[in-house]
């Protein structure tokens, strides 16, 4: 239950609002870092055998090779099989674009766990051209309870097939299949 706060002046109220807004994260979540559920990472790693975690920290990586804030994954060349669970804040579009471009130009396979924000520009520009796996219900992340948003696994490949899949812990089934004849230039 939240309590109502009384402010002495309009200026004090505005300062408090700016302070709260600065602390908050885009998409109405208290954090923009969500550690991948173990069961999901294990299943995807078994399928794709990841070489590198392209945006991690020493505390949350599940792979021996990873890029953190210091090494800045956005500035690295992504090749091979890449895992990406990016910060879910304002920079997520840059991460998704980098995944798409790396798949097209570097022949990387980039598997992303991201919020299913189908109304965003990056979703329409990039995710719509990839394999997308939606989850039944909301994921429960390792460092928190259920996410306040729906999630999806997006798989970028050079000559990938755009496929939409719904996933539950009991299995999955294909909903839509669209085949692109050739890779688009970036």
Predicted regions and their residues:
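BZIP DNA-binding basic region
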Residues: 1-22
